[in-house]
Design a protein with these regions (language model features):
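FIC/Doc superfamily catalytic core
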Residues: 1-337
Length: 337
């Protein structure tokens, strides 16, 4: 004779049905599984920083060298690096604005028929923020130029920005480079990935990582590749990738400045027989801008179109510059580094 069936036996036979809401068979009774809090997130990044201490110190040293170089160099070097970095970031972000089109937009507000004006405006904003002005520490909404259209809107931007800023303040003990990496990867989670997308996150991180630098107002992240900005993995792997990519970008920036300084010295010597203000102003424009058109040079130097074209032809004939865009109204020249 079989034993009587109890209510417990009935429930045991229903093993294939899901448990009650919130039930987790891997969690011991009495313990609820929770999302990691701010303290847990910060602890992960602190452990990641400790694991990358040697590489972090090495990269910080390279940043210090770039900062010193830019402090001693002409103002135009910072502007040039900001243009190059912004153009590289645009390709990573999907806007795909080339350096020549960006130069025309920043200098003359000119865009092609097929170009996205909103994308150009985003990348132009990146140039301005990378090149100077108050950093994100002065207030994220002001830095981004984003404000709530309706102050009483649900989930206002100012509230989301404040949450992100609070987490950054909580990570004040982290090195600025680590803290910038954390901020970049928490950007979307804070609900900040709106109209500016990854461009705003990367520019904010680039300025934050520079800390109190006087020469290097931003840390290059995308020059020579955007490995530093790739998502995926735990904080330890993200920070490792961040440092590797940042070191490569810093080396690219330093090599570029080496080549630019050598070109400037060579151009001064070759152009010494020329008289007037235009040759020197044109040489300076080619230092400040990676690509220059005749209308740009006319505006930057204040010289006549004829004087600009004559000097450009003279410099091209002596191998100082070369044309990079072919025929057309906006032919572009760059220094032969």
């Amino acid at each position: 004779m079989s034993a009587p069936i109890t209510p417990d036996d009935d429930e045991a036979d229903l093993w294939f049905l899901p448990g009650p809401p919130g039930f987790d068979p891997e969690t011991p009774p009495g313990l609820d599984r929770e999302e990691p809090g701010e303290a847990d997130v910060l602890a992960e990044w602190q452990r990641a920083e400790a694991g990358q201490a040697a590489r972090l110190a090495h990269v910080a040293g390279r940043l210090g060298a770039l900062d010193d170089r830019l402090t001693r160099g002409p103002e135009g070097w910072r502007h040039r690096l900001a243009l190059i970095e912004a153009a590289e970031l645009s390709w990573f972000a999907g806007d795909r604005i080339s350096a020549d089109r960006l130069a025309l937009w920043v200098a003359l507000r000119l865009s092609g028929v097929q170009e996205d004006a909103a994308a150009l405006a985003r990348v132009g904003w990146a140039v301005r923020r990378l090149g100077g002005g108050p950093g994100p520490e002065a207030g994220l909404p002001a830095f981004l130029g984003r404000h709530d259209a309706a102050p009483d809107a649900a989930d206002p931007f100012a509230e989301r920005a404040g949450s992100w800023e609070a987490l950054m303040a909580l990570g004040a003990s982290l090195h600025p480079i680590t803290r910038a990496c954390m901020g970049f990867h928490l950007w979307a989670l804070a609900g900040l990935d709106g109209q500016g997308g990854v461009t705003e996150a990367a520019v904010t991180a680039a300025r934050s990582a520079a800390g109190a630098g006087q020469g290097a107002l931003f840390v290059p992240l995308a020059m020579g590749g955007a490995a530093a900005l790739r998502a995926g993995g735990a904080p330890a792997s993200r920070l490792k990738r961040w440092l590797e990519g940042m070191e490569g970008a810093l080396l690219t920036a330093m090599r570029h400045l080496d080549q630019l300084e050598a070109w400037d010295s060579r151009a001064r010597a070759v152009m010494s027989p020329l008289s007037g203000r235009t040759p020197g102003l044109l040489r300076a424009a080619l230092v400040d801008w990676p690509l220059v058109s005749a209308p740009m040079a006319e505006r930057l130097t204040g010289a006549s179109r004829a004087a600009v074209q004559r000097n450009l032809a003279w410099m091209e004939g002596r191998g100082l510059i070369r044309e990079v865009t072919g025929q057309g109204r906006f032919r572009m020249w760059c220094a032969v580094l």
